[in-house]
Amino acid sequence: MEALETHARWVSETLVSGGRLFFCGNGGSAADAQHLAAEYVVRFERNRRGLAAIALTTDAAVLTAVGNDFGYEQIFARQLEALSSKGDLLI
């Protein structure tokens, strides 16, 4: 339970300070990353303003270009290099 509370605190602090959440995963976890990002952006259980969340698993062109040019192990790092800022959180 302590790990979950810590995670929730990190997410809350990131969003309150204007940071963005980035989600990534491989295989089935890639689908989970997309689902979680969508819940933050759209809504979860009740209407509220959208929250800044991005799944790094959605752009096939970027994923395959990075994999081809830099190696599969760089597909998320390269996107974070281009898109993230200090204060963002990778999940």
Segments the model singles out, each with a brief description of its role:
Residues 1-7, 13:
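An N-terminal, well-structured beta->alpha segment
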Residues 10-84, 89:
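Glycine-rich, small/polar surface segments that engage phosphate groups of diverse ligands
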